[in-house]
Amino acid sequence: MFDTCGPKGVKSQVISGQRENFVRLDSMDSRYSQSSETGLNKCTLNIQGGPKRFAQGSKASSGSFKKGFRKGSEGLWSIGRSIGLGVSRAVFPEDLEVSEKKIFDPQDKFLLLCNKLFVASCILAVSVDPLFLYLPFINDKAKCVGIDRKLAIIVTTIRTVIDSFYLFHMALRFRTAYVAPSSRVFGRGELVIDPAQIAKRYLQQYFIIDLLSVLPVPQIIVWRFLYTSRGANVLATKQALRYIVLVQYIPRFLRMYPLSSELKRTAGVFAETAWAGAAYYLLLYMLASHIVGALWYLLALERNNDCWSKACHNNQNCTRNFLFCGNQNMKGYAAWDNIKVSYLQLKCPVNVPEDEEPPFDFGIYLRALSSGIVSSKNFVSKYFFCLWWGLQNLSTLGQGLETSTYPGEVIFSITLAIAGLLLFALLIGNMQTYLQSLTIRLEEMRVKRRDSEQWMHHRMLPPELRERVRRYDQYKWLETRGVDEENLVQNLPKDLRRDIKRHLCLALVRRVPLFENMDERLLDAICERLKPCLFTEKSYLVREGDPVNEMLFIIRGRLESVTTDGGRSGFYNRSLLKEGDFCGDELLTWALDPKSGSNLPSSTRTVKALTEVEAFALIADELKFVASQFRRLHSRQVQHTFRFYSQQWRTWAACFMQAAWRRYIKRKKLEQLRKEEEEEEAAAASVIAGGSPYSIRATFLASKFAANALRSVHKNRTAKSTLLLSSTKELVKFQKPPEPDFSAEDH
């Protein structure tokens, strides 16, 4: 529908076959001024103001003048941009798309993914940097300190790959818009999309930290050592790595906190689930153990080097350079080579019997030297042993450490104890916070149950009522898990609320026969107004004679519906309601009546739950609206469905059929009595008029007997007909339910 033509930022739309151009007024920028300047030169008028066809003679001069004018305008435009003139803010994502350079929205999914990957790369970076401390090792055979070349190549390669993520992140920072602080009064705020302002802000905030973090100083030191063969470089490399890695570790570690805070501010949360948050802090604790283990390894090697240096200082055949591998060709090394093993084992022993005083106290580093990890090139065993030592002493706050009097060792132990205390408190606190979010609903339910028990005990409720309250609370918890679904949905926008209600209720509503054949519009209206209800076993939904304030549609469970026709003696009707049935249909008749007042109708039945019941409820006011939609259905199908499933209509139909059947039986019996009477009359007449040879006395007695028989027949017939008529009238007393108004007329 939209395409771009002419200057940048101007869109065109085809309306009724005509192309109409329009420009967003709130997106006007100085960029569009430049584009408009360029577009002006393409119009039919030249700079001198005359028509183009009259200026052909001075085409060369006017062209040069226009070129200079355009360059001057571009210069003024760039100066204005540099001092901040013009509008450089945007609110909507489409404003970012029309910019000349790609500017990312801080809440863009791609940028959020990149930030999460960068946090992961930061964690990997601070995990890789301590591996540089494992490069020095002790050659136990040559009694010298060397550099593990294979491990050095692997570590520097991994560090370089991770630094590439830093460079990519720094490039993204120059193209990521930010919310202007002055626009945070209401809503999201305005995004600053000017690349100059974005770059200025980044340079003033985190650029220096990122630059110090990404400097490849450790790689340069390691590769310089690998490409030189002089053994004296071992000492310089070891000292440089120790200081540079530790110094550069500070900005790398500090960069993680503002980045995670930025993720929480833009994405709302950093860890999507409670388990992810707990695992994140556990990972940080393991990272601290990894750092402590690497420092312990390096300090153990340094402490061993101090002992060797002290022993070498007391021996005239030794110089300090002999203690580092690669110096075998130095002058005087042969004399030292003959005595170094026995001499160093004598002066710096690591396996000393307990009853003897060692010549040199290694303190907390004795375990690293006696285990042989400082002289091993097996990185896996070396790494996990140091990791376990760091985790063990961080968790125990260094309680099992036996230090020497060496100040550096004591300071390291004190720092270890303080760091362990802080990290352990941080880990426990944050893990408790995250894990409590899993059980907060359960705890709220326990508090409510305790309050309910105290209240019932205070009010001295009978045991059966207490049991019903407990059963209802338990059933509601099992169904909702303590979540107030209604309030949760009500806080959402209307269209989203409608879609959620449709997703949750549509399939269940279609199972109700009354709603089965309705159109989508009516079903949406019904779903939007339905409210879920829960009823426990043996609870009464409505009682006969009470006002009906809602119509219930059964989703699960079984109910009993009973009526006595207003308490009339001798009348009792019972039926069962199951999934798909409804009750409270008196309210639908009331809602469809155009002359109904504000008084709610009375219930004609008592409805009791036989099992736990789930239902949807339509209250009276909402049903008024839905019922008004029913009248627009130009079909009798809904009316027939309503009659078929309505308990009122079913009861009336049953009584009506019983009355019709009894009337039929009455007519049959009356017909039979009439035939018997006719037969007896015919027999009596034949006796009288038959000319019998009996005497006149016998004839008189026969006529008298026939008259008495006819009188008894008439009496019995009258009594039976009166009884049948009275029973029929009793059945007909059950009035026909009022007819709902399903017409299409509005009222």
UniProtKB/Swiss-Prot annotation:
One family name in Pfam for this protein? Ion_trans
As for membrane topology, the entry says: Multi-pass membrane protein
For this entry, the protein name equals Probable cyclic nucleotide-gated ion channel 6
Q: What is its main location?
A: membrane
Occurrences of domain IQ (ranges): 650-679
Q: Which UniProt keywords apply?
A: Calmodulin-binding, cAMP, cAMP-binding, Cell membrane, cGMP, cGMP-binding, Ion channel, Ion transport, Ligand-gated ion channel, Membrane, Nucleotide-binding, Transmembrane, Transmembrane helix, Transport
Q: Which GO terms describe its cellular component?
A: cell periphery; plasma membrane; root hair
Protein's job: Probable cyclic nucleotide-gated ion channel.
**PROSITE patterns from the UniProt entry:** CNMP_BINDING_3 (PS50042), IQ (PS50096)
Which segments does the topology annotation call Extracellular? 139-150, 227-239, 302-407
- Side Cytoplasmic, residues: 1-117, 172-205, 261-280, 429-747
Q: Hey, which family's this protein in? A: Belongs to the cyclic nucleotide-gated cation channel (TC 1.A.1.5) family.
User: Which InterPro entries does its entry note?
Assistant: cNMP-bd_dom, cNMP-bd_dom_sf, Ion_trans_dom, K_chnl_volt-dep_EAG/ELK/ERG, RmlC-like_jellyroll
User: What's the domain of life for this entry?
Assistant: Eukaryota
Q: Does the keyword Transmembrane apply?
A: yes
Q: Where in the cell is it found?
A: Cell membrane
Q: Which gene encodes it?
A: CNGC6
Under the subunit heading, UniProt states: Homotetramer or heterotetramer.
